[in-house]
């Protein structure tokens, strides 16, 4: 009966106690010590630089807006000339790029046709060179055989004459 009153070992829950769990409120989120001297020097150095860059960005924005305000009426006044000129220039650039693309297409087609003819005849540069080497080897072999037979026949004739003289 004593076992029923005591909790079983697998039902024991352990809750570790953290000493600074909820103490301090917002202060616990902040670091305990202040910034280091290198961090302070970095901030002191970067503040004027970032301020200068921000000022330059603002000046650039104002200059762009003023330029747009001045140029818009000029574009409206000269649009009967500028629009056809822009269309003409765009057409010329497109024609130039198209002619280059057609030239490359023609060259690649010609290369493909030549390669297909080479494959049809079976004589590519490598096959032609191999065949030439094989023919040269056969020619040298035949000439060597003929020279050996000539030496043999000369030796036989010399041997007959040597035996006839003695």
Curated annotation (Swiss-Prot):
It is found in: Lipid droplet; Membrane. The chain crosses the membrane at residues 40-60, 73-93, 94-114. It comes from the Eukaryota. One of its GO terms (biological process) is response to freezing. Expressed in seeds (at protein level). The keyword Metal-binding does not apply. A motif (Proline-knot) lies at residues 73-84. The keyword Acetylation applies. Keywords: Acetylation, Allergen, Lipid droplet, Membrane, Transmembrane, Transmembrane helix. The modification N-acetylalanine is found at residue 2. It is a multi-pass membrane protein. One of its GO terms (cellular component) is monolayer-surrounded lipid storage body. Residues 1-27 are annotated as: Disordered. InterPro entries: Oleosin (IPR000136). Pfam families: Oleosin (PF01277). Belongs to the oleosin family. The proline-knot motif may be involved in the targeting to oil bodies. PANTHER family: OLEOSIN, OLEOSIN 20.3 KDA. May have a structural role to stabilize the lipid body during desiccation of the seed by preventing coalescence of the oil. Probably interacts with both lipid and phospholipid moieties of lipid bodies. May also provide recognition signals for specific lipase anchorage in lipolysis during seedling growth. This is Oleosin H1. It comes from Sesamum indicum.
